[in-house]
Amino acid sequence: MKMKVLVFFVATILVAWQCHAYDMFPLRMNTGYGARTPEVKCASWRLAVEAHNIFGFETIPEECVEATKEYIHGEQYRSDSKTVNQQAYFYARDLEVHPKDTFVFSIDGTVLSNIPYYKKHGYGVEKFNSTLYDEWVNKGNAPALPETLKNYNKLVSLGFKIIFLSGRTLDKQAVTEANLKKAGYHTWEKLILKDPQDPSTPNAVSYKTAAREKLIRQGYNIVGIIGDQWSDLLGGHRGESRTFKLPNPLYYIQ
């Protein structure tokens, strides 16, 4: 009798586990690294993106459009951006500044906000259209990300060199310079844009790694890197830097 009860108990546990196995892993993906999540918990999905546990996605989950919209336009996004920028400043203010000590910033999603573009294109649920995005960039109306602008001004006042390293292409130099100044970024050491004809840098990580290597050869001491994409922060030739990842749940750049 005891044996029958034990067998029944074990069988009940196994059935229950099978029924609820999916619930234990609510972020398990159907395809890719996160393009479709059938019962996604959007705050958890966003955290996994920021922690680089979900990557390589082309679009955000359809179920998360409203949650993403609320996050981007709510207090949390601004607070998250503020916290990251504050930590960069707290780190910087304790350093002894030397003439070629440099902070490297990405541009889109880091110093200039592209939320106005994504607001018109589904907050990341639409696949990226480079033609439409370039048209938006060429208008030169991207606003500053306010917490980054505050941090930028503090770093400049401390005496750090500022270098903007962007995936924008060389043909956008004039509009990018004008947009930066219009948004309040009044001075910088270098603005580095991508040569689309260069076959040696097929993706963002290799391009930004090569650019940092060149900066180090030129004598710059990279003490900090600030970006909204992991491709801004990964790779070699980061000098003695700390890296600071700003929030961006809208898209992923390889």
From Swiss-Prot:
Glycosylation sites: 129
Tissue: Accumulates in the stems of developing soybean seedlings.
CDD domains assigned: HAD_VSP
Keywords annotated in UniProt: Glycoprotein, Seed storage protein, Signal, Storage protein
Signal peptide: 1-21
Keyword GTP-binding part of the UniProt annotation: no
Propeptide positions: 22-34
Recorded superkingdom: Eukaryota
Pfam families attached to this UniProt entry: Acid_phosphat_B (PF03767)
GO molecular function, one term: nutrient reservoir activity
Sequence similarity: Belongs to the APS1/VSP family.
PANTHER family per record: ACID PHOSPHATASE-LIKE PROTEIN (PTHR31284), VEGETATIVE STORAGE PROTEIN 1-RELATED (PTHR31284:SF19)
NCBIfam families for the chain: Veg_Stor_Prot
Cited function: May function as somatic storage protein during early seedling development.
Protein name as catalogued: Stem 28 kDa glycoprotein
